[in-house]
Amino acid sequence: MATMVRSMALEGIEGFAVEIEAATIRGQQQMISIIGLGDQAVKEAGERMQAAMTCYGYDLPKDKTLISLAPGNRRKRGSHYDLGMALALLSETEQIAARNIDQYVFIGELSLDGRIRPCTGVLSMITAARQCGFKLAVVPAENLSEARKISGIRTYGLHTLEEAVKLLEGREVI
């Protein structure tokens, strides 16, 4: 069974919800495969995720990992899916006990050392997330003031992958 989290995509200034699904396929060669009409930044996310995860001591899956960005017929551009993909993978492999992971929208590029880098288009993505009915969002700390301009959605500004894990596990995030 796959783990699903959500992010947002932009077409111009209009946003739409993206479902990020992570599944491991046992018995196949170790690799991360990302599908769903992503650009080069999306395709490179696997390398950033692996580096960020190992910085915090998480294990890479021993089998093939498939990450799907849906809807599959709409283009996904940018590196802001990294955080959602990493959290979906950690939850799928039962390395974190994420509570309510499916209720959040995740936006953020991961650095190789696990920091969450700022992104462009956060205001439009949070606006679209609220319009889609989402109540919780995680964005890079540097984008928090921009994201908080949108009412009706609770937004957390985080600095690292580990802070996101703590939030999802119900541990205090300072």
Give the predicted meaning of each segment.
Residues M1-I174:
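Peripheral, non-AAA+ core regions of ATP-driven protein-machinery
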